[in-house]
From Swiss-Prot:
Domain RRM residue range list: 1-73, 79-149
Matching PANTHER family: SERINE/ARGININE RICH SPLICING FACTOR
Residue positions where Phosphoserine is found in the record: 161, 220, 242, 244, 256, 272, 280, 520, 523, 527, 562, 582, 618, 620, 623, 627, 643, 649
Keywords: Acetylation, Cytoplasm, Immunity, Innate immunity, Isopeptide bond, Nucleus, Phosphoprotein, Repeat, Repressor, RNA-binding, Transcription, Transcription regulation, Ubl conjugation
GO CC list: cytoplasm; nuclear speck; nucleolus; nucleoplasm; nucleus; ribonucleoprotein complex; transcription regulator complex
Protein name, per record: RNA-binding protein 14
A single GO BP: positive regulation of transcription by RNA polymerase II
Length: 669
């Protein structure tokens, strides 16, 4: 038999003491003491009834009368009332007696400054709330309302739909202005657990804590500018920063001269003259360059192929670079329009910005036709001498590439030289007109060409006597000998002409006096030796040293070197191109090597395990042991070859290469 003992002070009442109290009335099976009540199990029903009758109202402690009765199972439905702001002087028995005046109280528990009272009937609970809410008990106004748990559910009762937090319509009677509380969001209805059918209400809006941009699973799509993967472009920036120049120079087919230069640097230009098909050389000279005055300065400076090739291959040829490209890629000192004296389509006659300007009629150059220098310097050895009409007419008897030139007589075209623009050679600080006749050889002149006379110009280049005829400057070659191809010219024919031509071919087009004055014969000899036919180069080596030395430096050092060595020694490697002779790629070109290099170079992103003294660091007392530092960009970004992020991000490919994101991705979650 189970006996309920109420109003027990659980703090100072032990089960043994309570069992000794019930022992005289029968056998006590067990005794359990709770906070303010206890349960005693007795074997015999008669002994239990005797104990209830004798001990009910007994004071185990002074002032605390026990409530002893048969234990009853709790009713299936009770109404739980919350009583707040309970005074510390109010006991559970006093609170129970206060509520029992309004109805049967099943249970009353006081916890600190609040209490819960369970009443059997709903009407009694509502009456108690209405009467006792705001009532002063032991000096404090109590707050009485239905508990948030509402009605205790029996096993057969359905779950209430709608608001779970408060009883529907139950307002605060102490403050009548407030109606029944309703939750702002009904989770059961929103997530499909509503027991009722469709009630006509629209679905409530999603609560704000899982907004689209805050959800870890569903982010806003990245902006379109970042969607394109960066692998589309880094190859252009990493390996060949100058797209048209580098790619064409490295990878163009044999249509461009760059391949010829790269594969056979010794006799590159001679080989290109011998081996190039007629499409690449003859057709531009024959068709495009037939009318030199019709070409614009930009087309002229684009090189031997003019408009016949796309800009990539045109830029990759020798004379065909623009101003910046040719200064990077040509023989080392050549400007855009003079980049190679062999390949320019409109060297001195057809270019508006780089021809030789207004010179006197007696000048050796004005006897050339405007289109005579369109051919290579090697192919028209007679172009620089003041040749007679008969000798220059021999050009008309050459291949069809010169037949298309507008003038039959070369010395009849002195007018185009007088009509050139101010950017031509006439605008240079020291024109050729002002050269005195005193200097007989170019090497013996301490000053630049500004000090030379007009009349002996032809002789001054090859260190020949002024009195000799123009044919003498070409090695006394007969005019018919000029019709031979570039590779077939005799050594004697090439001797004088290269002495004159190479100097012009190696000069930039901007100012001629200063380059002639300051440029040593090293770049001239090297650029000449690196590109000529071996036969022509041998004839050039046979020249006296002072015939070519503009600055008075002997060229024997360059002549004793092999042509490849001269080319390697004197050609400044272009900063943006890679040739066969280029050094191996830096780690900057490879994103994975770059990542390792970056992580070693910048200490903030360096991993501790990569340090040589990592063991000593971790064993020292002053080191803060922490996991290896993780860069903020580790696995989210692709290598961005030219961004500043690469400097500070360390090895950002270490962890998850498959999850690399674009460079604008948010770096910290």
């Amino acid at each position: 038999m189970k006996i309920f003992v109420g109003n027990v002070d659980g703090a100072d009442t032990t089960p043994e003491e309570l069992a000794a109290l019930f022992a005289p009335y029968g056998t006590v099976m067990s005794c359990a003491v709770m906070k303010q009540f206890a349960f005693v199990h007795m074997r015999e029903n008669a002994g239990a009834l005797r104990a209830i009758e004798a001990l009910h109202g007994h004071e185990l402690r002074p002032g605390r009368a026990l409530v002893v009765e048969m234990s009853r199972p709790r009713p299936l439905n009770t109404w739980k009332i919350f009583v707040g702001n309970v005074s510390a002087a109010c006991t559970s028995q006093e609170l129970r007696s206060l509520f029992e005046r309004r109805g049967r109280v099943i249970e009353c528990d006081v916890v600190k400054d609040y209490a819960f009272v369970h009443m059997e009937k709903e009407a009694d609970a509502k009456a108690a709330i209405a009467q006792l809410n705001g009532k002063e008990v032991k000096g404090k106004r109590i707050n009485v309302e239905l508990s948030t748990k509402g009605q205790k559910k029996g096993p057969g009762l359905a779950v209430q739909s709608g608001d779970k937090t408060k009883k529907p319509g139950a307002g605060d009677t102490a403050f009548p202005g407030t109606g029944g509380f309703s939750a702002t969001f009904d989770y059961q209805q929103a997530f499909g657990n509503s027991t009722g059918g469709f009630d006509g209400q629209a679905r409530q809006p999603t609560p704000p804590f899982f907004g689209r941009d805050r959800s870890p699973l569903r982010r806003s799509p990245p902006r379109a500018s970042y969607v394109a993967p960066l692998t589309a472009q880094p190859a252009t920036y990493r390996a060949q920063p100058s797209v048209s120049l580098g790619a064409a120079y490295r990878a163009q087919p044999s249509a461009s001269l760059g391949v010829g230069y790269r594969t056979q640097p010794m006799t590159a230009q001679a080989a290109s003259y011998r081996a190039q098909p007629s499409v690449s050389l003859g057709a531009p000279y024959r068709g495009q360059l037939a009318s030199p005055s019709s070409q614009s300065a930009a087309a002229s400076s684009l090189g031997p192929y003019g408009g016949a090739q796309p800009s990539a291959s045109a830029l990759s040829s020798y004379g065909g670079q623009a101003a910046a490209a040719s200064s990077l890629n040509s023989y080392g000192a050549q400007g855009s329009s003079l980049a190679s004296y062999g390949n320019q389509p409109s060297s001195y006659g057809a270019q508006a910005a780089s021809s030789y300007g207004v010179r006197a009629a007696a000048s050796s150059y004005n006897t050339q036709g405007a289109a005579s220098s369109l051919g290579s310097y090697g192919a028209q050895a007679a172009s620089y001498g003041a040749q007679s009409a008969a000798s220059s007419l021999a050009y008309g008897a050459q291949a069809a590439s010169y037949n298309a030139q507008p003038s039959a007589s070369y010395n009849a075209q002195s007018a185009p030289y007088a009509a050139q623009q101010a950017a031509s050679y006439s605008s240079q600080p020291a024109a050729y007109v002002a050269q005195p006749a005193t200097a007989a050889a170019y090497a013996s002149q301490p000053a630049a060409y500004a000090a030379q006379a007009t009349t002996p110009m032809a002789g001054s280049y090859g260190a020949q006597p002024v009195v000799q005829t123009q044919l003498n400057s070409y090695g006394a070659q007969a005019s018919m000998g000029l019709s031979g191809s570039y590779g077939a010219q005799s050594a004697a024919a090439a001797t004088g002409s290269y002495g004159a031509a190479a100097a012009y071919g190696a000069q930039p087009s901007a100012t001629l006096a200063a380059p002639y004055r300051t440029q040593s014969s090293a770049s001239l000899a090297a650029s000449y030796a690196a590109q000529q036919h071996p036969q022509a180069a041998a004839s050039y080596r046979g020249q006296p040293g002072n015939a070519y030395d503009g600055a008075g430096q002997p060229s024997a050092a360059y002549l004793s070197m092999s042509q490849g060595a001269v080319a390697n020694a004197n050609s400044t490697p272009p900063p943006y191109e890679r040739t066969r002779l280029s050094p191996p790629r830096a780690s900057y070109d490879d994103p994975y090597k770059k990542a390792v290099a970056m992580s070693k170079r910048y200490g903030s992103d360096r991993r501790l395990a990569e340090l040589s003294d990592y063991r000593r660091l971790s064993e020292s007392q002053l080191s803060f042991r922490r996991s290896p530092t993780k860069s903020s960009l580790d696995y989210r970004r692709l290598p961005d070859a030219h961004s500043d992020y690469a400097r500070y991000s360390g090895s950002y490919n270490d962890y998850l290469r498959a999850a690399q994101m674009h460079s604008g991705y948010q770096r910290r979650m």
